[in-house]
Amino acid sequence: MSRRLRRTKIVTTLGPATDRDNNLEKVIAAGANVVRMNFSHGSPEDHKMRADKVREIAAKLGRHVAILGDLQGPKIRVSTFKEGKVFLNIGDKFLLDANLGKGEGDKEKVGIDYKGLPADVVPGDILLLDDGRVQLKVLEVQGMKVFTEVTVGGPLSNNKGINKLGGGLSAEALTEKDKADIKTAALIGVDYLAVSFPRCGEDLNYARRLARDAGCDAKIVAKVERAEAVCSQDAMDDIILASDVVMVARGDLGVEIGDPELVGIQKALIRRARQLNRAVITATQMMESMITNPMPTRAEVMDVANAVLDGTDAVMLSAETAAGQYPSETVAAMARVCLGAEKIPSINVSKHRLDVQFDNVEEAIAMSAMYAANHLKGVTAIITMTESGRTALMTSRISSGLPIFAMSRHERTLNLTALYRGVTPVHFDSANDGVAAASEAVNLLRDKGYLMSGDLVIVTQGDVMSTVGSTNTTRILTVE
């Protein structure tokens, strides 16, 4: 190998900050592999314009950048106050009234956007407002009114979120707005579609059906942010198996299950998703201080590094790039931390699933290739010649310090593999098949500077290049 590649990928959120001063190009140049469009904000026209710009810049820079559309999900929030904000003291009585109109809130009461809240709570439940900064204990429920007492005081302003400690709010995962946004996602041609607040696998299956009906074949991302989704191993598996990608959305999830539980859940989700051949994104407040500061805190550095050590495919930036003062600097800082963490030898130790039966020939080839790569002295890279990107995903589920090159003629496949840990997408097309095509691919990587003469590489491919799911061959070649 002639160059060192970052294995952990970076997801960046688009917003006003990336719209100005050529920041979008700077962010992609700094190392963004996936861009996230938050459908909570902006019009369909805004999203289409940003997507077009991303593709234009990616082509200009010779990069493959995936586009992730993030559905808003149910709005479980307080309504608005007359003065815009109140301060609640410990011991205050406070009413949540589903019948109260917007702008009528005060120090004693406020409306709620989610009209099903009174049916979801009972006396003794703890409600967490504004990510837990204000906490209320339910005293009584009368019709559409929830009477509470303040147990943790503080300021409360318009439209702050409501969570229930331990989960249990029954709001549907997909709203009418989400269904409209799925059509926008289809129009844009997003590579990934994130579903907010799924309660179970069926929520994700429903989203997938709606997406297909709209003409959107994006991979489905499960944003794990409800306590119900992680309350047991079966619940966790149900969500993971129904998705293509898992996002550890630590904000709402941490509020519902409590911060002490979050550490173990993050590690369990990442570990289990990799076992089940799913990709993983770790998100929320990873470099929050860089919204206003040019350097991350040491705690943020450790947080990103620990996610890398856990085995995450990608780490995500939200407000840091969408609305921060230093969007490209934040991406560059995160890239440096990832590279630093990837130097630690333990994360490259093979964890082969030798006790697990493989589901298909493709998986058997991917696992055997990685076993050979990790045990044959002198191997410098793995090359997957892929139509769908599936083999690249499965090879990347096995820990290794070796780069994996996903080589495909399909732009969408290359964009999808931009998310996968350790995978570098490279455009490749050939009229040849078999060993001739494999040699051609190896020579292309050598000419691009990824390989050097004398390198030993492992290639996976099918008998015919243009057939999806046909991977059935592993070759070991020496670069000429």
From Swiss-Prot:
Allosterically activated by AMP and by several sugar phosphates. Belongs to type II PK. Keywords: Acetylation, Allosteric enzyme, ATP-binding, Glycolysis, Kinase, Magnesium, Metal-binding, Nucleotide-binding, Potassium, Pyruvate, Transferase. GO terms for biological process: glycolytic process. Pathway: Carbohydrate degradation; glycolysis; pyruvate from D-glyceraldehyde 3-phosphate: step 5/5. K(+) binds at N38, S40, D70. The modification N6-acetyllysine is found at K351. Substrate binds at R36, K223, G251, D252, T284. PROSITE patterns: PYRUVATE_KINASE (PS00110). The record marks K223 as: Transition state stabilizer. InterPro entries: Pyr_Knase (IPR001697), Pyrv/PenolPyrv_kinase-like_dom (IPR015813), Pyrv_kinase-like_dom_sf (IPR040442), Pyrv_Knase-like_insert_dom_sf (IPR011037), Pyrv_Knase_AS (IPR018209), Pyrv_Knase_brl (IPR015793), Pyrv_Knase_C (IPR015795), Pyrv_Knase_C_sf (IPR036918). It holds the Pfam family PK_C. Its EC number is 2.7.1.40. Belongs to the pyruvate kinase family. PANTHER family: PYRUVATE KINASE. Homotetramer. This is Pyruvate kinase II. It comes from Escherichia coli (strain K12). The gene is pykA.
